[in-house]
Amino acid sequence: MQIRRKHPNPAVKVESLSYVVKVPEAQPQNILEEIVWHKEIEVDKLRERLPLLELRQKIANTAPPCDFLAALKQGKTQPALIAEVKKASPSKGVILEDFDPVAIARTYEQGGATCLSVLTDSKFFQGSYENLTLVRQAVSLPLLCKEFILYPYQIYYARSKGADAVLLIAAILSDQDLAYFVKIVKGLGMTALVEVHSLAEFDRVLAIEGIELIGINNRNLETFTVDLDNTRQLLEARGEQVREKGILIVSESGLHTATDLAKVKQAGANAVLIGESLVKLPDPALGIQKLFENLG
């Protein structure tokens, strides 16, 4: 299913009156499309408050980003762990009521995480860019900004808030946008984690030059259902191409146990992104150690 961009139902103005005619096409087809439509409005407002020129000047005065990709290659664990600072999601609602992003990030670092991911979407995941900045100030690990990026502006904004890497979701970006965004990310010294869910998306991304890190999401973002076998299926189909290109693979979503990790590691994943199952633990640092103690 194609994810539509701009809300197709603009206001109609007649003299001093303004009204909206509701049509069936004006309703989002699924959760992902609803998120994208809201993000369009959010980014427009952000641009008004902070123009791109000012944003780029701000970035020019910041320290260079950490090397997210190199950290994953060196991995403190096998597979390398990207631990996610996550309060809520559309499928689960609030995961942790007493949410302290800094405390969570520090326990992840103590537990042996290689990198961290911070949710910045506010409406659907109750995240924020403030959380990203706070975590950046509290830990030394490379940080991924977990966001629904539609425009180059968001990449610059994420960098200004402390991100070392950004998520680019193939389902909501054209091939042209993906290729262009990857160049912008690299130009800023950052890493692009390009996310796919289906074999069709995987093929699209593998055909784009310059992509070094691909995330296979076991969650269908249209329905938010999870199939852990998705990583194995996609790597069975295209694993040879991935290895030939020297691309690192991150398995995302639905990972809860050491058995789950062993399964995706055997399938060919170099890293895993885990959030919900760690956030809920009373001691995430200990939880990380137990998850990885027998994987080697």
Swiss-Prot record:
One of its GO terms (biological process) is L-tryptophan biosynthetic process. Gene3D superfamilies: Aldolase class I (3.20.20.70). GO terms for molecular function: indole-3-glycerol-phosphate synthase activity; phosphoribosylanthranilate isomerase activity. The gene is trpC. Its EC number is 4.1.1.48. It holds the Pfam family IGPS. It comes from the Bacteria. It catalyses: 1-(2-carboxyphenylamino)-1-deoxy-D-ribulose 5-phosphate + H(+) = (1S,2R)-1-C-(indol-3-yl)glycerol 3-phosphate + CO2 + H2O. Transmembrane segments: none annotated. The lineage of its organism: Bacteria, Bacillati, Cyanobacteriota, Cyanophyceae, Oscillatoriophycideae. This is Indole-3-glycerol phosphate synthase. Pathway: Amino-acid biosynthesis; L-tryptophan biosynthesis; L-tryptophan from chorismate: step 4/5. It comes from Microcystis aeruginosa (strain NIES-843 / IAM M-2473). SUPFAM superfamilies: Ribulose-phoshate binding barrel. Keywords: Amino-acid biosynthesis, Aromatic amino acid biosynthesis, Decarboxylase, Lyase, Tryptophan biosynthesis. It is an enzyme of class 4 (lyase). InterPro entries: Aldolase_TIM, Indole-3-glycerol_P_synth, Indole-3-glycerol_P_synth_dom, Indole-3-GlycerolPSynthase_CS, RibuloseP-bd_barrel. Belongs to the TrpC family.
